[in-house]
UniProtKB/Swiss-Prot annotation:
Designated name of the protein: UDP-N-acetylmuramate--L-alanine ligase
InterPro entries documented for this protein: Mur-like_cat_sf, Mur_ligase_C, Mur_ligase_C_dom_sf, Mur_ligase_cen, Mur_ligase_N, MurCDEF_pg_biosynth, UDP-N-AcMur_Ala_ligase_MurC
Organism name: Zymomonas mobilis subsp. mobilis (strain ATCC 31821 / ZM4 / CP4)
Similarity-based family: Belongs to the MurCDEF family.
The enzyme's E.C. designation: 6.3.2.8
Cross-referenced HAMAP family: MurC (MF_00046)
GO terms classed as biological process: cell division; cell wall organization; peptidoglycan biosynthetic process; regulation of cell shape
Annotated NCBIfam families: murC (TIGR01082)
Function as written in the Swiss-Prot or TrEMBL entry: Cell wall formation.
Amino acid sequence: MKGVGTDIGRIHFVGIGGIGMSGIAEVMHNLGYQVQGSDISEGYTVDALRQMGIKVLIGHHAENVKDAAVVVVSSAIHRGNPEVEAALENRIPVVRRAEMLAELMRLKSTVAVAGTHGKTTTTSMVAALLDAGGIDPTVINGGIINSYGSNARLGDSDWMVVEADESDGSFLRLDGTLAIVTNIDPEHLDHYGSFEKVQDAFVEFVSNVPFYGAAFLCIDHPVVQSILPRIRDRRLITYGFSAQADIRAVDITPISGGNRFTAVIRGRDGDIRRIENIFLPMPGRHNIQNALSAIGVALEFSIPDAAIRDGFARFGGVKRRFSRVGEIKIGDGSVLVIDDYGHHPVEIKAVLSAARESAQQRVIAVVQPHRFSRLHDLMTEFQSAFNDADMVFVAPVYAAGEQPIAGVDSQALVSGLKQHGHRSAQAVDSPRSLAIALADIIKADDIIICLGAGDITKWAAGLAADITSIREVHHL
């Protein structure tokens, strides 16, 4: 990698523990840059960065940037932050995360993965197939790739795979040689102002692909399909279950631990190619769609069919994407506890559908709504997102820094679920109350799936042990 000299001075990341910031910091550190950062609290990511030799300070204070040559901020950091204000006062350049990522991307050919949902898993799948094909990409992802134990890795090849976050529009800085759009849903309207402007941004993202590149779009998603006529001068490759897709999945068979399917690829010359007997060790039709886009990228590199099969077979998944975090023994059987990041109604539906595919008995959903504003804006969608769950437990809303909104809380969601016909929904106020409620009702081969982007992951981590303890005390 050549480009910005490593002698530019110390680069300070404000909020370095964030999943997007930490990946860039890790790659730049491994390239030889002087990297440090600050965050408001300790955590897994902070510990990992320190183990790499990166200095991380806890708390945001003006003195943290006194030796910095550049300050990098995420979209979560705003004016008024003492480190940002100190940098501006001392004329230290302040750059957004996407701008720094764009600098790294400018030095390599890039696969940029965008979409409202599925970006992290898709980015991981693309990286897995390139690895299997003998290409060693640099990867910057929005989640921990289990096979790496990190969300980032510095590779030796001239290619980079990045997750392109659309939340604040900054993904338009990320010009991919190859681009993927998984879906387009009405999210981040506080930034864009309208859903039409969200769609405009994705059209621009695809239009930024160079003439020698390509964009892969999921034709199954109606909004993605609707933007196809607006992009006339770029090479577009569609994928999905649709008979019109250029890359299509057929012969789909849900099996233990995932899905088996055949990919059918229609070339521009009309020739048909089949990659049969692909095993994807992840449940859910949405993950097959994600896999099809990764196959499309792999074919651009002429990666052989056998390597594609091998890459998927060895795919270890992503942390907090249908991750098994606990098991409760009941007689000769057990109950699995699954942790998943899904927090938008579309994601929740997809995850519960995947759980339903793999469940032998009941699917028990535990959801922690993320942000009062999201629950308020999408209340109707949330109320109909849990049809594949036999039972729903709703934890208190994870505020993520927001102020409460009157009438928008866990009880409101429970009431709405019941009004929309759900037979079993109730609120719980703590991990302990959840464990007590579940201890008496679970049966062998049930699946408990914890959903949300907040600290519900901590609830999930301790749930199996808590339930087991309660059942032992009460001889259940």
